[in-house]
A protein has these predicted regions:
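Short catalytic/signature loops enriched in Gly
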Residues: 14-20, 160-164, 257-317, 375, ...
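ABC ATPase NBD coupling module
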Residues: 38, 80-81, 94-111, 129, ...
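Conserved ABC transporter NBD signature motif
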Residues: 82-93, 359-370
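Conserved ABC ATPase "signature" region
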Residues: 92-93, 145-164, 417-434, 543
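Conserved ABC ATPase signature
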Residues: 168-173, 177, 439-443, 447
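A short, proline-enriched helix->beta-strand linker immediately N-terminal to the Walker B motif
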Residues: 188-192, 458-462, 478
Length: 592
């Protein structure tokens, strides 16, 4: 079931005569540490008008989330504190209000939506109880009246079957539905100001689109002022009236969204906008698909049994990947895209032997075997770069040891030659030999990902599997890492299996693309074919949902999906229907 489609003009210009509801004046935030008091945010000032959407944009460590926590009075005491300035709301300086008065304002007059909905909800309370608890904490009313208000809030956020949702627990809802519940709690008391701190970062792109549409509509309907904290300039372009750009705790630039994107004044803003990958900027790339594939996958199938009951019997089965076929050719970047649960990361794990699978995987014409000797040989030919570099690096080892470790495991070279190789690789990824004796925690996120890439290159692999390898990085760092991957491919002649949910990144880096949905490939072809002439409805939906960093763009009319995503879990004995394909020529296949 879908709601009526609407055509929305993006980022309307704010009226100057609207009253100001919140003023921040010369705000300073500091932290106490062993080294003394360190400034985190310095001399920040801005006004927020009624009904306006102000985006506070910047990269990690810019101070944007600290600013939102300061407004809410939620800075972690005693280390982090407001060191100076004012936060004026309704004639009161929030920095000087006692906690009991701030508790009354929080949720009632100023509400906040956090990035991760699961951590914002109590996992052992039903949704209805959490809503009514928040409502009755601020407005004395009967349980029946509070329940009616809770139901009204769930209806306002367009949640299907709101009566049933009241009785459910958070874990029974999808990520997008949980975020809608968090928004429902925030609007239940009809606040004057809503702060949304990266409200869609943890969500899939189509769910993100629905949540952004919802926030825009609710702000208009309820006359709320909205502060949107984000690092995504595409989201800024589509949502904001005005933009405040922060870097390292300082205000860099503030302007209307049209002025900021049309004529950014500061070098940092210009660099930030130039780093954003844009749809429609991919280039035609030639791949010799008549040559023998480097990797050939046929009828790949991965399932997981779900056990339960007193006898711990298999009760259902997750069909993570179901009978997919694809080839990867020498020197190409083959991208697999899709949303959470589509099976794309499972494909990577199957190729590297990390999960049991059915079907045939061939590397250079030979089947990949699962015995230890074969798997050791496979790791020389195939390496992975994971999403979270900090989790992928042993914090107790120096980065030099981490890069030398694959050479030690495979018995390659002498101690000196391994050090020489590590030095060479560090220089190639933009880090000098002086870093060899440092530890992972001493580096930034982008530098740690470069270390992971250096380690992956140590064995001179023919295929690197990059599983969401840039999704956790700031946009400017992401751009430099993507450029590095392109340079390394050209220099060493490697192939990439690039796994991502970011359609703009994929269009800019991939030679060919496979779109996955519920464990199956629904469209496959060259980047130009898939992005320039998408045929499957799901592919078109993914492309349409991607935020675009241009506030002049008008969001096309689109029906909002209120249905829940289908599940890959099926009863034992049942399997999903295997798709068949229609060929559009030149290797462009679409599921029918």
């Amino acid at each position: 079931m879908t709601a009526p489609a609407t055509t929305t003009s993006v980022a309307p210009v704010a009226a100057d005569d609207r009253p100001t509801v919140l003023s921040v004046r010369n705000l300073d935030i500091s932290v106490r540490s062993d080294a003394g008091i360190q400034p985190l945010v310095q001399n920040l000032s801005f006004d927020l008008k009624r009904g306006e959407t102000l985006a506070i944009a910047g990269e990690s460590g810019s101070g944007k989330s600290l600013t939102s926590l300061a407004i809410m009075g939620l800075l972690p005491p005693p280390a982090v504190h407001v060191a100076g300035g004012e936060i004026l709301f309704d004639g009161q300086d929030l920095t000087r209000l006692p906690e009991h008065k701030m508790q009354h304002l929080r949720g009632d007059r100023i509400a906040m939506i956090f990035q991760e909905p699961m951590t914002a909800l109590n996992p052992v309370m039903r949704i209805g109880d959490q809503l009514t608890e928040a409502i009755r904490a601020h407005e004395p009313m009967s349980a029946r009246a509070a329940r009616a208000r809770a139901l009204e809030a769930l209806q306002a956020v367009r949640l299907t079957e709101p009566e049933r949702r009241l009785k459910q627990y958070p874990h029974e809802l999808s990520g997008g539905m949980r975020q809608r519940v968090v928004i429902a709690i925030a609007i239940a008391l009809r606040p004057d100001v809503m702060i949304a701190d990266e409200p869609t970062t943890a969500l899939d792109v189509t769910v993100q689109r629905d949540v952004l549409d919802l926030l825009r509509e609710l702000a208009t309907e309820m006359g709320m002022a909205l502060i949107l904290i984000t690092h995504d300039m595409g989201v800024v372009a589509e949502m904001a009236d005005r933009v405040l750009v922060m870097q390292s705790g300082r205000q860099v630039e503030e302007a209307s969204v049209l002025d900021l994107f049309g004529a950014p004044q500061q070098p940092y803003t210009q660099h930030l906008l130039a780093s954003v990958p844009r749809m429609g900027q991919g280039r035609e790339r030639g791949v010799d698909t008549k040559a023998r594939p480097l990797v050939s996958v046929r009828d790949l199938r991965v399932t997981y049994d779900l056990r339960g009951g007193i006898l711990d019997r298999v009760q259902a089965r997750v069909h993570a990947v179901e009978k997919i076929n694809f080839d990867i050719y020498a020197g190409e970047t083959f991208a697999v895209v899709g949303e959470s649960g589509c099976g794309k990361s499972t494909v990577a794990r199957a190729l590297t032997g990390l999960v049991p699978h059915e079907g045939v995987i061939q590397f250079e014409g030979k089947p990949l075997l699962r015995d230890r000797a074969s798997q050791l040989a496979n790791t020389r030919a195939m390496q992975m770069v994971f999403q979270d570099p900090m989790a992928a690096l042993n914090g107790r080892m120096t980065v030099g040891d981490l890069v030398r470790e694959p050479l030690v495991i495979h018995g390659i070279g002498t101690a000196q030659s391994r050090t020489d190789r590590a030095t060479e690789l560090f220089e190639r990824v933009g880090l000098g030999p002086e870093v060899l004796d440092r530890y992972p925690h001493e580096f930034s996120g982008g530098q740690r990902q470069r270390i992971c890439i250096a380690r992956a290159l140590a064995l001179s692999p023919k295929l690197i599997i990059a599983d969401e390898s840039v999704s956790a990085l700031d946009v400017s760092v992401q751009a430099t890492v993507l450029d590095l991957l392109e340079e390394l491919k050209a220099e060493f002649g490697m192939s990439y299996l690039f796994i991502s949910h970011d359609m703009a990144v994929v269009e800019n880096i991939a030679d060919r693309v496979a779109v996955m949905y519920l464990g199956q490939i629904v469209e496959i072809g060259s980047s130009a074919q898939v992005f320039g002439n998408p045929q499957h409805a799901y592919t078109r939906r993914l492309i349409a949902a991607a935020p675009y960093p241009d506030p002049r763009r008008v969001i096309p009319a689109r029906a909002r999906s209120n249905s829940e995503l289908k599940s890959p879990v099926m009863p034992v004995g049942q399997s999903p229907e295997i798709v068949s394909y229609r060929s559009l020529g030149d290797g462009h296949l679409v599921a029918v």
